[in-house]
A protein has these predicted regions:
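Long, low-complexity segments enriched in small/aliphatic residues
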Residues: 62-159
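Long, contiguous, secondary-structure-rich segments that constitute the structural scaffold
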Residues: 36-38, 42-87, 150, 156-170, ...
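Flexible glycine/proline-rich, aromatic-decorated loop/lid segments
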Residues: 1-31
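Pocket-edge structural micro-motifs
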Residues: 9, 30, 47, 112-114, ...
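Structural motif
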Residues: 5, 136-138, 168, 210-211
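Short, well-ordered loop/turn elements at secondary-structure boundaries
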Residues: 1-3, 113, 132-135, 164-165, ...
Length: 253
């Protein structure tokens, strides 16, 4: 677990506080069960930690924390704690405390001279590396339905782990037939950065000429293979496009 200190935090169903999602909804979450033992609300743990670091934090409850947030975030204008207690959920922006939030933004136009959106086209940049004779395929990575991100939580669920228990690389059946592969074969996936050995899965949803690997299995780390080259503007690594090759190998001992 690699932790020097473990705080007795509360679970989601034990918390009082707000959740703000990408749909611009500010929702008040209320506890439905009591916290067990020495468990405490997240804000209480953070306040106590801040005090021990020498900060003069004196919040008495979660509503004080929210009120300070609202004072610095224009998106929370007219959405105070008492309103959330009454309505449970409010969309921002809300232009008055007695008006509903704007569920559809820019419905009456955009803040431009014409009232229309300004759309700026962009020039697409080629990938850092393209397939060639040595690495003729494109490797892309992503998630599987059953495991979230690195699987730190979902792989501890026996139900989810039973559905996706082992790492696989997915390939279109036509590509596999050309190479003489069978379902479940052990294969080596190589890029210019490394090699991972795992089993093969046929998947017609994978485009011909491509391979797909999930990145949630530490025993077959997909990011040993991916390209760390950064996008020049967003500074995002090129995890979704790497030149790769695949070959059949013996089952590891």
């Amino acid at each position: 677990w690699f932790a020097d200190i473990i705080f007795p935090a509360s679970a989601q169903a034990e918390k009082l506080g707000t959740y703000t999602n990408s749909n611009r909804q500010v929702q008040l979450g209320r506890p439905v069960v009591d916290m067990p033992g020495d468990a405490r609300q997240d804000w209480e743990l953070i306040v106590e930690l801040a005090k021990r670091c020498g900060l003069d934090w004196n919040y008495e409850n979660v509503s004080e924390v929210y009120t300070e947030m609202a004072g610095h975030m224009e998106s929370l204008d007219n959405i105070d704690w008492s309103r959330l207690e009454r309505e449970s959920s409010v969309c921002y922006p809300s232009f008055a405390s007695d008006l509903p939030g704007e569920e559809i933004i820019f419905f009456s136009g955009f803040p431009t001279a014409s009232g229309k959106a300004t759309i700026v086209p962009t020039d697409l940049l080629p990938p850092d590396e393209l397939p060639d004779e040595e690495y003729p395929l494109v490797l892309t990575t992503g998630r599987v339905l059953e495991h979230w991100h690195t699987g730190a939580m979902t792989r501890r669920s026996s139900n989810l782990e039973a559905q996706e228990p082992i790492p696989v690389v997915s390939m279109h059946p036509r590509d596999a037939k050309i190479k003489g592969f069978a379902k479940g074969d052990w294969v080596s996936v190589k890029t210019r950065r490394g090699e991972v050995i795992l089993q093969l899965k046929f998947d017609r949803d994978v485009t011909q000429g491509m391979l797909f690997m999930p990145f949630c299995y530490n025993e077959a780390p997909a990011n040993f293979l991916t390209n760390p080259q950064l996008d020049p503007y967003g500074k995002i690594p090129e995890f979704k496009f790497s030149a790769a090759k695949i070959s059949k190998v013996e089952k590891p001992k």
